[in-house]
């Protein structure tokens, strides 16, 4: 039987593979946006799951940038994690490193959110205040 992670367990897994403050900030940002859209789109009973998908979407990026979305599947399967989580996080690499298409609305939101939060973060860094006025 596959394991469901709570937020604390997901954070521990993320920080096992990521230490760069930028990557951790990005993960928390995507988590927050995913939680927002889960509620906004009528998936209120899955807010925590959507958030964990956002938090773990780049689990393997810091250690395995050339194997992004590939290594994370192995890492999660070794821990017997939920296949929905594995599919969702891997799908945001569709057309780049994997051929797993975003199918569920959550996966499509992740696909867009990952890029948009990166763009917004880059734009914020261009401001004199940088990220100092942004609190997650």
Residue positions per predicted region:
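A contiguous pocket-lining binding segment that forms or flanks enzyme active sites
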Residues: 101-131
């Amino acid at each position: 039987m596959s394991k469901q992670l709570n937020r604390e367990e997901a954070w521990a897994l993320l920080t096992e593979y990521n230490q760069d403050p930028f990557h951790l900030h990005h993960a928390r940002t995507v988590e927050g946006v995913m939680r927002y859209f889960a509620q906004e789109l009528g998936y209120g009973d899955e807010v925590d799951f959507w958030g964990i998908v956002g938090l773990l979407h780049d689990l393997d990026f810091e250690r395995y940038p050339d194997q992004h979305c590939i290594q994370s599947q192995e890492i999660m399967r070794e821990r017997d994690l939920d296949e929905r989580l594995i599919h969702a996080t891997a799908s945001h690499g569709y057309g780049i490193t994997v051929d797993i298409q975003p199918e569920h609305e959550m996966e499509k939101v992740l696909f867009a959110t990952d890029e948009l939060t990166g763009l917004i973060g880059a734009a914020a860094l261009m401001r004199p205040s940088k990220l100092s006025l942004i609190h997650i």
